Amino acid sequence: MKDLKVMKKESSQFGLDGNPRGDNLFIWDIKLKDFPLDSKLGKNLKEYSEKYKREPVIQLEMQFPHDYPMTPPFVRVVRPRFKFLTGHITIGGSICMEMLTKSGWRPINDIEMILVQIRSEIMSDSQASLDLNDADRPYGEQEARDAFNRMVQRYGWN
């Protein structure tokens, strides 16, 4: 898989780390890392790391449909939890980006491009911050899918 080779080779320069889960090429575990410490999110991640004894990263799960790249992957935050309506993260942990919907998806998108764009969207919100009282409680997959479907309906995407 071409995307896997690219991720192994170049991802660290973009603050990304990702691998398939075991032998399953359809589910990837991703880490977004190296957020600037002078940003609200960077400070929150440092505090999260110290409080919960975890890496100061945003853990994502990326699930690929069998007809990828014709259909977009489903991407969700696993942990930490974000404050409501910050960082382009829905209340259920899905990513609020049209490019991850059928109407916004382009088959030429590759994994690295998707993740760089997600990271950029999160960082573009200067108010992106964690819910430090509940940050270590993971988002559930169904919770994320439900939030994603509500978002798609709200914005008229499909």
Labelled PLM ranges:
Residues 1-57, 66-158:
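UBC/E2-like fold recognition across ubiquitin and ubiquitin-like conjugation systems
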Residues 63:
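Conserved metal-binding segment of the jelly-roll/cupin
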